[in-house]
């Protein structure tokens, strides 16, 4: 036992010497490993003889031939780390480019974007042969058609099935209705209105006469009464329970009215605009009320009829050209902004021209006060402010009287009678303004 204790103490001393050494890399020799082997055998032999209280403490042994390295600690940089995406190098942002020193790539010139012109080889075999696949399918069918007409057909992208051959039929015969359908007549029911009681006497009188077609004298009201009852009339025009029915009734009457009744509708709208202008009404609400909703329809149908008699009524070339241009812009181009911009640059000095201006004014005035970026609102505000009751109808009467002083043509008389046609319906007309 004494000999085993001496061996254990000597092995322990050598182990402590190895652990206390300052060398970073420790290499355990074979001799030490043999001693440790004998030590382990001696410890195993005495485990049965020794009591648990007298057992030696286990000694932590490092495995043989293991190298231990100490990694030096890296010093951190005091400057902040900046991360730059490679996308910024290819497509640098203007702000980041100035901050990080990137140079912005110059934009390619227009010349560099253009593809290089195709230069065909002199060899005829190198030229692409025209095949039916790369040709326009309509080219062959339109080769004998007028180039202007062929260009319009191509722009409209009319399909090949709609192109007619020289000996073809003008339309598809299966579109023709049957004899039964041709003998039917559709019954158009009038607009149904709900019962609406009006306390104001003027409003009740206007609505009662507007439901029927009668003479303009029956619907005439003094401007004084209209001004005194303006707020009640405005409540009816904006908040009536039959608002949609009234609007449709007036549109139907305007579409089928003669020129005299169209002038009466224009006088009604001009007077209503002037009353709203004097009482600081809301133009957005006016644009959607019963009276002024039909301003575009009135302007369109009135100028359609003006175009029919300007050749005989207007002898001056510039007057005829101006009125014809305004009618064409409104009726065929739908450009109220272009027509209104043209009008504000002019001073009208002939009656038919002023009448056309009054047809345009309700439409252009509401357009300029509800659509931003319009610079002709002040011009048409002056037109509304300077309007006198019944001026549009008075201009028509004066123009016809002046014309018949010089014109004795029967054809002109028949044309004016057909256009004026005072016997047409004027349903929906609420009032005709009379001077005070």
Swiss-Prot record:
It holds the Pfam family Herpes_UL69. Its main location: host cell. Signal peptide: none annotated. The lineage of its organism: Viruses, Duplodnaviria, Heunggongvirae, Peploviricota, Herviviricetes. GO terms for cellular component: host cell cytoplasm; host cell nucleus. Belongs to the herpesviridae UL69 family. InterPro entries: ICP27-like. This is Immediate-early phosphoprotein 57. It comes from Alcelaphine herpesvirus 1 (strain C500) (AlHV-1). Residues 104-119 have a biased composition (Low complexity). Residues 71-140 are annotated as: Disordered. Acts at a post-transcriptional level to regulate viral gene expression. Keywords: Early protein, Host cytoplasm, Host nucleus, Phosphoprotein, Transcription, Transcription regulation. One of its GO terms (biological process) is regulation of DNA-templated transcription. Residues 127-138 have a biased composition (Polar residues). It comes from the Viruses.
């Amino acid at each position: 036992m004494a000999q085993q204790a001496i061996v254990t103490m000597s092995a322990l001393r050598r182990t402590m010497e190895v652990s206390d050494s300052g060398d970073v890399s420790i290499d355990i020799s074979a001799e030490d490993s043999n001693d440790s082997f004998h030590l382990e055998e001696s410890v195993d032999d005495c485990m049965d003889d020794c009591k648990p209280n007298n057992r030696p403490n286990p000694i932590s042994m490092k495995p043989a031939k293991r190298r231990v390295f100490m990694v030096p600690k890296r010093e951190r940089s005091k400057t902040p780390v900046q991360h730059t995406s490679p996308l910024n190098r290819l497509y640098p942002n203007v702000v980041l480019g100035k901050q990080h020193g990137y140079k912005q790539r110059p934009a390619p010139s227009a010349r560099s974007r253009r593809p290089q012109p195709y230069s065909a080889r002199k060899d005829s075999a190198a030229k692409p042969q025209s095949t039916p696949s790369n040709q326009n399918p309509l080219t062959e069918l339109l080769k004998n058609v007028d180039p202007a007409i062929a260009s319009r057909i191509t722009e409209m992208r009319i399909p090949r099935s709609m192109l007619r051959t020289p000996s073809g039929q003008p339309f598809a015969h299966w579109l023709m209705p049957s004899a039964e359908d041709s003998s039917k007549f559709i019954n158009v029911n009038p607009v149904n209105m709900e019962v609406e009681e009006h306390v104001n006497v003027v409003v009740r009188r206007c609505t009662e006469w507007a439901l029927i077609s009668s003479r303009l004298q029956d619907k005439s009201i003094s401007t004084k009464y209209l001004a005194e009852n303006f707020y009640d009339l405005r409540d009816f025009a904006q908040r009536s329970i039959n608002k949609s029915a009234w609007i449709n009734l007036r549109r139907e009457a305007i579409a089928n009215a003669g020129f005299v009744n169209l002038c009466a509708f224009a006088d009604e709208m001009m007077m209503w605009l002037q009353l709203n202008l004097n009482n600081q009404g809301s133009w957005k609400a006016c644009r959607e009320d019963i009276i002024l909703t039909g301003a575009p329809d009135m302007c369109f149908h009135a100028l359609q009829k003006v175009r029919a008699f300007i050749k005989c009524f207007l002898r001056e070339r510039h007057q005829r050209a101006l009125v014809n241009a305004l009618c064409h812009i409104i009726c065929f181009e739908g450009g109220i902004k272009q027509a209104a911009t043209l009008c504000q640059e002019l001073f009208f000095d002939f009656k038919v021209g002023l009448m056309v201006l009054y047809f345009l004014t309700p439409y252009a005035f509401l357009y300029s006060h509800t659509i931003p970026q319009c610079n002709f609102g002040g011009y048409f505000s002056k037109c509304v402010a300077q309007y006198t009751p019944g001026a549009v109808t008075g201009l028509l009467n004066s123009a016809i009287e002046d014309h018949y002083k010089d014109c004795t043509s029967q054809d002109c008389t028949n044309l004016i009678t057909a256009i004026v046609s005072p016997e047409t319906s004027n349903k929906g007309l609420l009032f005709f303004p009379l001077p005070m």
